[in-house]
Curated annotation (Swiss-Prot):
Compartments where found: Cytoplasm
PROSITE patterns reported for this sequence: PCI
Gene designation: eif3m
UniProt entry tagged with the keyword Protein biosynthesis: yes
Main location: cytoplasm
The protein's name: Eukaryotic translation initiation factor 3 subunit M
Coiled-coil intervals, chain numbering: none
Length: 402
């Protein structure tokens, strides 16, 4: 799918195209009635093209028996027929349903059907919003149903622009994002979460099921650590106080805060399907990250980690390895001094204190750079003076010899 302007050219009249498609359907072994051509001629005689198209739509699933190499050309004929239809968007919707039925009956034809959907998408006028929604919905359905996600993945980033070009309403766009999120979750959890997050951002009016699912997935995910972009969303702020307290702890609290919270909210966790063990593990990693940002001289002792996590000091290295793997901290461990030398740490909340700390680090860095520049310039100046003196001596020697 390209999303660019596309012109489909079929060099024949409407009547010839109708007869070609009707004869093809009648010749299929699965079509026992063999009456498509006769009915089409009857409808054409009364200039009832709409009934011709409706008839084709009911018989297109017969193409499940067609050879793969013939499917795309014959369906291109139907695409051309519906281009000038007054009920174009309705016909596209039913056409997409028929294509899904063909794939369900013969999933070997799915790649060819996706190619047909691509042609249909590129020939559909951008402003026909419901047509684009129908086509993209079928593309997502077929690629995820028949394990062809690799075909879909490169196009996901274009979905917002394509729907915006078509003028799709906010409510329809939101519903589509939720649909995509569910469809692709087993293939790409990160992309799925991104579509759900965008859906939640589109409606500030209520905390519906999508909002609760977003929070649940973020809280339980072993890879999601920064909650600022979720906590501030208006629909999330409408959730019950217990959930907001948990999000606040995940944003800037420590392990002790979570232990206290979960002791009072065990039933709430079960009701909201929050994974207490997964959150406890996440809080330990986040606690280490916070300790790392506050460590004096960028050195964190194992003892401080053990104290904050309420664990034996012998377990600290394993947790530090996990927090480094999670990308929250970078550093070097020393078994001799039982410390972590911190090279980089992630701030969970970036407020006034963090801005002050950043300013101090940048000032220190600037001072170090100025000192290094002075050190580097000093030998260069000495070398220039020495070279000048040597040149003068050589010149004098030449003059004397002459």
């Amino acid at each position: 799918m390209e999303g660019s302007d596309f012109i489909l050219v079929v060099d024949s009249s409407v009547e010839e195209q109708v007869e070609e498609l009707a004869m093809y359907l009648d010749n299929l072994e699965a079509n026992t009635d063999k009456n498509v051509l006769a009915l089409c001629r009857e409808y054409l005689a009364s200039e009832n093209v709409k009934e011709v198209l409706n008839l084709f739509l009911t018989r297109l699933p017969l193409l499940a028996q067609a050879p793969e190499k013939e499917l795309e050309p014959i369906l291109a004929v139907f695409i051309n027929l519906i281009q000038e239809s007054a009920a174009f968007e309705d016909h596209v919707s039913k056409f997409c349903q028929a294509l899904e039925q063909i794939a369900d009956q013969n999933n070997n034809l799915t790649p060819a059907i996706l190619s047909v959907l691509s042609i249909l998408f590129n020939t559909a006028v951008k402003e026909r919003q419901h047509a684009r929604l129908s086509i993209l919905t079928s593309v997502v359905t077929l690629t995820t149903r028949y394990s062809l996600f690799s075909t879909l993945a490169p196009n996901l980033k274009y979905f917002p622009d394509w729907l915006k070009e078509a003028g799709v309403s906010v409510s329809d766009h939101r519903a589509f994002n939720i649909f995509v999120s569910k469809a692709i979750q087993s293939y790409d959890d990160e992309q799925s979460f991104a579509f759900l997050l965008e859906a939640v951002k589109m409606d500030n009016s209520t905390a519906d099921e999508a909002v609760r699912e977003l929070v649940q997935r973020a809280v339980n995910s072993p890879k999601y650590f920064f909650f600022d972009d979720i906590v501030t969303l208006p629909p999330v702020q409408q959730l019950e106080q217990s959930t907001l307290q948990l999000l606040g702890i995940l944003s800037g609290g420590m392990t002790d805060d979570y232990v206290s919270w979960v002791a009072e909210n065990h039933a709430h966790c079960q009701h909201q399907k929050f994974d207490e063990d997964a959150i406890a593990r996440k809080m330990k990693l986040l606690t280490i990250a916070s300790l790392a940002t506050q460590a004096p001289n960028n050195t964190l002792s194992y003892g401080d980690v053990a104290k904050s996590l309420k664990i034996d000091e012998n377990e600290v290295e394993l947790w530090i390895i996990d927090v480094i793997r999670a990308g929250l901290v970078e550093g070097r461990m020393s078994q001799l001094t039982k410390t972590l030398s911190i090279h980089r740490s992630s701030y969970r909340v970036f407020g006034k204190h963090e801005w002050v700390a950043l300013h101090e680090k940048l000032a220190k860095w600037g001072s170090s750079l100025r000192y290094m520049l002075q050190v580097m310039e000093q030998p260069l100046s000495s070398f220039t003076i020495a070279s000048s003196k040597k040149g003068n001596r050589d010149g004098s020697a030449v003059t004397a010899s002459e």
